[in-house]
Amino acid sequence: VPQQPLVTYPTSVSGDCPDIFRVGDKWNINLADYHYVQVDAPGAVNPEVLQYDCGDLRVAKTMFDGKRRVILGWIGDYAEKKDSGNYEWGGIMSMPREIYADSKGILYQRPVQEAIDLFDNQVMAKDNIVLNEYMENVPLDYMLHATLYGNDDSKVSLLFRQAQKSNQEDAYRVSIDYKTGEIALGNRYREHKRVCEFDKSKPLDIRLFVDGTVAECFINDAYCFTMRIYDCKGTGFSFISEDMKVKIKDLSICSK
């Protein structure tokens, strides 16, 4: 018996490789990259397109383990395995994340505890970080966790896989603009950016996983940024800001 479609996608997104799951009273339909739509009854036409990730994550799928809904997908390749290359089809798998909904049903991500537990060898711990100070001799692969304290107009960046202090371009970058709410993960060739909602008066939690050719960054255990990384192999990092009132506290870097 013919049935009414659950949803008719907007033409602005690709609807291939869907993943469909229910949270509360709403059905979530993940689309080809990191966008999704929500419907509460069949027949929806052109519902609002939302995003649960930002960057290179593609065709993610979810599963339920009895307690949480876990999501993973592939992270795209770039031609010639260079940061400057054109985007290509295919890639490497992401780490598993927990995808969850807030009280309004909006989807967010945080790392599964099992992924955090893999990085159990602490190689650096600092209560306070000096801004604009280059720190080196960290592993190529690690998990960085820190708390940021900013102001209404603060701009702060975390540079990682940084080769040397004098060359900030030879690094990857997580940038946070408190005034606009824009957060980005990028390099000299591209930037994956979105506006995130966060209380500027409260500490901001950042957890960055750097593993092989992948960077996955979680802000406040809610907003996730995903990027393929090839070129930069530096063992340094730094927090950069012109606002000297910015505070970076409770830094921890752990390797596997």
Task: Give names to the regions the model predicted.
Residues 5-11, 16-21, 25-33, 69-75, ...:
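Hydrophobic core segments of beta-strands in well-ordered, beta-rich domains
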Residues 35-40, 61:
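Flexible glycine/proline-rich, aromatic-decorated loop/lid segments
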